[in-house]
Amino acid sequence: MDAMKYHDLRDFLTLLEQQGELKRITLPVDPHLEITEIADRTLRAGGPALLFENPKGYAMPVLCNLFGTPKRVAMGMGQDDVSALREVGKLLAFLKEPEPPKGFRDLFDKLPQFKQVLNMPTKRLRGAPCQQKIASGDDVDLTRLPVMTCWPDDAAPLITWGLTVTRGPHKERQNLGIYRQQLIGKNKLIMRWLSHRGGALDFQEWLAAHPGERFPVSVALGADPATILGAVTPVPDTLSEYAFAGLLRGTKTEVVKCLSNDLEVPASAEIILEGYIEPGEMAPEGPYGDHTGYYNEVDNFPVFTVTHITQREDAIYHSTYTGRPPDEPAVLGVALNEVFVPILQKQFPEIVDFYLPPEGCSYRLAVVTMKKQYAGHAKRVMMGVWSFLRQFMYTKFVIVCDDDVNARDWNDVIWAITTRMDPARDTVLVENTPIDYLDFASPVSGLGSKMGLDATNKWPGETQREWGRPIVKDPEVTARIDAIWDELAIFK
């Protein structure tokens, strides 16, 4: 992988501007609903990232739509094009289950991968740009940040791109996660993390090891794109997101110790929120419009108390909105889809392609094509998708087709479903499985069912009937008609 070089978010914005991928908005625009309207229209048209230089009522510019096209996601991951993300996936598959060299020649073939791994360790700085300006105590005021209100019935302004940094009591490695945070006071946010996410797991372990003690948390806003994307990529549990970001960027990730705790944050981030979660301090979060296109239920989550705000000079506030696809999470899903394919193929070599349609809210429906080898094979692949990567724990529907079907063409997929499936025989229903908390269609919050559709050709043992043979054109006839097609002038 030849990394597209940039050091921090500002470098990346310069790169985008040089390629016509960034638009500066000088007209005053309100972070309350108006920025969402403009960003939504721009994203749906495949437009540029937007830097609102004069948000109404605030002195800090707002960056939106940063990852609004698959190309910009690829650029953030150090690549020129989305197709190159397959190489990122191959590297992750290698790191997840590295294979020792089989000989001297194989060692040389693997050297590029080992060389990339050497870029992984972080570089710790004594001082950093993210600590150029410091507010603490009574000077902490989150209302000075141009936090967006995205939809008319949202409960309050919402931080959407907060890179949350935590560490469990028994872990050397920090966890990075993107969790939305509702603004409820000058120094108070609600930390909405689901129970299986890394930050929530760190918090639960802390409560068990240090009952009654405050849990240190830091949040980075405006980190460099590689670090942000590292937090939403299926990085192996043994690898830190910072290390993976360094791999993407081609240089070690620079971090700095926080002022009030021992957590390490991206040194070049625009803004850092430092603070703690008081055990037992909870608050009702929501409702908010989310990536499903609906407002979610109100539920209680921990309160994050901010004790310090540090930031760069002339800091930029990075934000987004979530709504019915297409939105930024859906675009991220399209790009990261290419990363997932090699990881799945390493575990299941029979998989030819894997596709998460963006209209399926990024992860709720998956289409898999495979080289089927035996009766029941499609069901094995279904179960593998649900269990191998935790990113697909919430995937409700898995459709499995043969490799003569294009997973990314609904015409092909629907044809396979309607001609190769018997609804009773080829539908797999699994009850009482983990489901996204935001999925109000499930009968119980966080618990619901899954459906697998086996749309493959059936083998002996799966059917007693003679199976249909697909129609295939005679290639000689096709060639003869190709030769006279223009002469026929049918469409002239």
Swiss-Prot record:
Active-site residues, record numbering mapped to chain: D290 (proton donor)
GO biological process: ubiquinone biosynthetic process
Major subcellular site: membrane
Catalytic activity: a 4-hydroxy-3-(all-trans-polyprenyl)benzoate + H(+) = a 2-(all-trans-polyprenyl)phenol + CO2
Binding site residues for Mn(2+): N175, E241
The enzyme's E.C. designation: 4.1.1.98
Protein name as catalogued: 3-octaprenyl-4-hydroxybenzoate carboxy-lyase
Gene: ubiD
